[in-house]
Amino acid sequence: MYRFAPSPTGDMHIGNLRAAIFNYICSLQDKSGFILRIEDTDKERNIEGKEKDILEILSKFGIKPEQIYIQSENLKFHRQLASKLLIDKKAFACFCTEEELEAKKQKAKEQGVAYRYDGTCERLSDAEVLNCEKPFVIRMKKPTRTMSFTDAIKGELSFEPDAVDSFVIMRADKTPTYNFACAVDDMLEGVTFVIRGEDHVSNTPKQDLIREGLGYTGKMNYAHLPILLNIEGKKMSKRENESSVKWLFEQGFLPEAIANYLILLGNKTPTEIFTIEDAVKWFDITKISRSPARFDVKKLEQINREHIKLASKERIKEIFGVDESKVELVKFYTQESSLVPEIKAKVEAIYSPKIAPDEYKNEFEIIKKAARNLKPCESFDEFKKELMGATNLKGKNFFMPLRALLTNDLHGPELSELYPLIKDDLAKILI
């Protein structure tokens, strides 16, 4: 069972989307199932409506979870299982105040050593714990052995006990920390394979330790994806437009193209242009590069252009809001643009009232009047010949205003290539 577990705290990052796509593809390959879990326990950072945004984005990519879980609905289980760990002496109550902990952290910093919890409260007797009325958190006891796991991308990874430390699993307000809620939920929901970003590598031994402490014996597999870099080779910040899936949609990138590019990054694929359905046939999570990959919007534009060219008539009609007669015109304009709004604007300009260029106003009106009176012409050569004869214009004085009349622009593709696509609509265009 695979899962995607985003938090509703902001716009979806392309790194998160990449993880969702990889999890979904792998679930289709081994038919083990795919679930969505909304990790909404951080009430202060949650943004209303983001759960809906997550579902809508996944839907655009054709990602269909078999089950949707809301993490906060598992709170009673989190509390019950934290209590079990206390009873079983796998965890302990910690009464250390923030001020006390901060002083210890500062001392470690001054000594030039990494801070580790010193076990103060772990040494308290049961009587001392029961008689203490101070607020407390629950800490998982530091492991007594090296914690190891095999990562499908990074290979064998090991963490010494001090690196895992005695970490907090329940806050003083009786809400779970990320690692505890995540570990428990994966266990309860039957997750067996976790594909996520490499920023979670250090969380993995903690989550494994929690499940071990609860007596869970199910095997968990992991694959931690290298981070995505911007074009300058720096880690992509959430403040960068390109990192937002919503922004990419707004710019006119198709879900098909975005998915294609995210699968392509740091991967050796049999072809450059493909769909998620294609990738299911050959994708191998173990072949993902261990090195970070650069996200290049220009490359994504090229891929977007190819997906527009390959799109079915129905898909073009859906994306661009055009009827069937304009489908080939849309694809024709991919030679000039790769983004939906740009192509849409060029097509709409052809069917909009035309504006005469200042330097060709007189010629524009002459050509417009003559063109309206021409008999239908099958080819551009015939159309050009008839129109030149009727207007006595030639060269720039003919072609520039003619282009403006047909496209509302003085620059663009070859009119001889455009004409076959619009000849049947000349009556609508010559306005």
UniProtKB/Swiss-Prot annotation:
Its EC number is 6.1.1.17. GO terms for biological process: glutamyl-tRNA aminoacylation. It catalyses: tRNA(Glu) + L-glutamate + ATP = L-glutamyl-tRNA(Glu) + AMP + diphosphate. PROSITE patterns: AA_TRNA_LIGASE_I. A motif ('KMSKS' region) lies at residues 235-239. HAMAP family: Glu_tRNA_synth_type1 (MF_00022). This is Glutamate--tRNA ligase 1.
